[in-house]
Curated annotation (Swiss-Prot):
PANTHER family reported in the protein's UniProt record: TRANSLATION INITIATION FACTOR IF-1, CHLOROPLASTIC (PTHR33370:SF1)
Annotated protein name in UniProt: Translation initiation factor IF-1, chloroplastic
NCBIfam families hit by this protein: infA (TIGR00008)
Superkingdom of the organism of origin: Eukaryota
Native organism: Coffea arabica (Arabian coffee)
Length: 77
C-alpha cells in the first residue's frame, strides 16, 4: 500500500547545506524541505524567494520533499 502524502505550495526562506531548504507553506507553517532526485539530476537551481510545490508525509509533517519549482508570475521589476 502506497503512503499517502499531502501536497502544498510554499516559499523558500532559507538555503541550508546538502540540498535542504527552510520552506514557509501557504498556511504559514515552517518546515524543512529537501530536493527530490529528479530535480537534483536535472540541475534545477532553487534559491531563497522561489515558490515550490512540496510533498509532505502524513507521519512527519515537519519535513517534506520539494517536487516542483513554480515559475515566477510575470514580476514587474
Amino acid at each position: 500500500m502506497k503512503e499517502q502524502k499531502w501536497t502544498h505550495e510554499g516559499l523558500i526562506t532559507e538555503s541550508l547545506p546538502n540540498g535542504m531548504f527552510r520552506v514557509r507553506l501557504d498556511n504559514e507553517d515552517l518546515i524543512l524541505g529537501y530536493v527530490s532526485g529528479k530535480i537534483r539530476r536535472s540541475f534545477i537551481r532553487i534559491l531563497p524567494g522561489d515558490r515550490v510545490k512540496i510533498e509532505v508525509s502524513r507521519y512527519d509533517s515537519t519535513r517534506g520533499r520539494i517536487i516542483y519549482r513554480l515559475r515566477n508570475k510575470d514580476s514587474k521589476d
